[in-house]
């Protein structure tokens, strides 16, 4: 029906705006003791609204801390539990969740951290948050298995007629900061931590850019360091480039055979597809 898609989009946008305003009404009441926004008063009777609002006040901070802490575990460890709780509450206030699944909330958190004045002394924190988010999203991505038979296309087709398909949720993060080194230091046992954090301090003293690929191995998302050619190659694949174009973007320093071996062992690759265009 002509115009049906437009009407559906308008309805969805209206619902999103309505939910955002509802969350902000609750947050406004949460922040100002004894107040209740007009829109909320109109939707709820006095006693019922007061009880619901009190429950919201009691639980919102804990909910925000748990939800963001699950997705941004490294950042939480870096800033400390108390400071992270304050950040989570502040973020909830400005970017309230719009869906019931709080696992989907927080995609704006890295960018929000990058603009936060109090975090200016930690210029690498936002990129660490981006890595945390990539790991979180990867573990929530759809399951998939390697189409091993499709690898035979590499022997029978011109590279310009093939595309490599990465596993769902595979992510690429490139940073001017040593994000892989920082992340690693926060994952290891306490008896090895001193040496790992010394490496972090050295890396931050002379900032070294690092690129990582995030892929799930079994049930856990894993961080894999990439060099420059590997990162350029991976970005081309994520952009949908054919094999020939991706090889050109990676440059002469790229070792395709070596990458393919890592991709198969690390479960990065879903399969090879012949281009239809």
Predicted regions and their residues:
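Hydrophobic packing positions characteristic
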Residues: 94-221, 225-228
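N-terminal, charged low-complexity regulatory/assembly segments
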Residues: 2-145
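Preference for short coil/turn "hinge" residues that link or interrupt alpha-helices
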Residues: 72, 157-159, 236, 262
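N-terminal cationic amphipathic segment used for targeting or macromolecule association
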Residues: 1-2, 213
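C-terminal structured interaction module
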Residues: 219-277
């Amino acid at each position: 029906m002509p115009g049906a898609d437009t009407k559906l989009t308008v309805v969805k946008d209206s619902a999103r705006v309505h939910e955002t305003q509802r969350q902000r009404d609750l947050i406004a009441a949460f922040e100002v003791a004894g107040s209740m926004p007009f829109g909320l008063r109109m939707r709820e009777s006095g006693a019922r609204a007061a009880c619901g609002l009190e429950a919201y006040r009691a639980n919102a901070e804990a909910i925000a801390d748990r939800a963001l802490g699950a997705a941004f575990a490294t950042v939480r460890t870096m800033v400390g539990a108390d400071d992270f709780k304050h950040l989570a509450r502040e973020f909830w206030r400005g970017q309230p969740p719009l869906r019931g699944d709080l696992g989907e909330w927080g995609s704006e958190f890295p960018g929000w951290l990058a603009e936060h004045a109090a975090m200016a002394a930690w210029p690498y924190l936002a990129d660490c948050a981006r890595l945390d988010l990539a790991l979180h999203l990867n573990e929530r991505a759809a399951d998939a298995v390697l189409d091993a038979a499709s690898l035979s296309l590499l022997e029978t087709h011109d590279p310009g007629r093939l595309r490599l398909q990465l596993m769902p949720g595979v992510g690429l993060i490139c940073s001017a900061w040593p994000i892989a080194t920082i992340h690693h230091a926060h994952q290891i046992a306490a008896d090895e931590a001193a040496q790992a954090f010394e490496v972090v301090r050295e890396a931050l003293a002379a900032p070294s850019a690092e690129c990582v690929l995030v892929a799930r191995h079994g049930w856990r998302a894993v961080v894999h360091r990439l060099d420059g050619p590997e990162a350029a190659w991976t970005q081309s694949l994520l952009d949908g480039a054919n094999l020939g174009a991706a090889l050109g973007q990676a440059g002469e320093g790229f070792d395709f055979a070596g990458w393919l071996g890592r991709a198969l062992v690390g479960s990065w690759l879903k399969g090879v597809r012949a281009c239809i265009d």
